Design a protein with these regions (language model features):
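Enzymes that bind and transform nitrogen-containing heteroaromatic metabolites
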Residues: 1-152
Length: 152
């Protein structure tokens, strides 16, 4: 599964059981990235993705998603050692927000692609693609191509 998260400059994810921020350009980019594949979300995230038709709503999207499917994670931290995770897609707000939930990306994950674009309510959004490394090699051969995440 591909995990999609939005983080601030301190890797903050959420504060007081709420998302730190939102940006409709990020939501549009997520929709383009996912394409026709399933996007698993919680009911909390539903209002962000009203225009997306291939949504799957679950209280535990990470438990339901299969290989090659996407999970948008908003309110809870992640176990980055989870072998089910094929790739991380991180949207950075390029700001610091209050946070009581954060994510630490382990050393086994390698930043493979970066893209910057203007958001609607954020001057700059940074999209980062992380792939798992195995013995110093990229085990999934993932890359960003034309706004889509692909595996070779």
């Amino acid at each position: 599964m591909y995990i999609i998260i939005c983080l601030d400059d301190n890797n903050g994810l959420a504060f007081n059981h709420r998302r730190q921020s939102q940006d409709r350009i990020v939501v549009e980019d997520i929709s383009k990235t996912v394409g026709e594949k399933k996007l698993w979300i919680t009911d909390y995230s539903r209002k962000l993705f009203q225009a997306v038709s291939n949504l799957e709503i679950s209280e535990n999207p990470k438990e339901e998603a299969k290989k090659g499917e996407y999970v948008f994670q908003e309110l809870e931290t992640l176990d980055t050692d989870d072998e089910q995770i094929e790739q991380f897609i991180i949207y950075r707000w390029n700001r610091v927000y209050p946070a009581d939930v954060s994510v630490e990306i382990g050393v086994e994950w390698k930043l493979t692609e970066t893209e910057e674009f203007p958001g609607f309510s954020h001057e700059k959004i940074t999209k980062e693609i992380y792939c798992r490394e195995s013995n110093g090699e990229n085990s999934f051969g993932c890359f960003l191509s034309g706004g889509r995440v692909s595996n070779t």
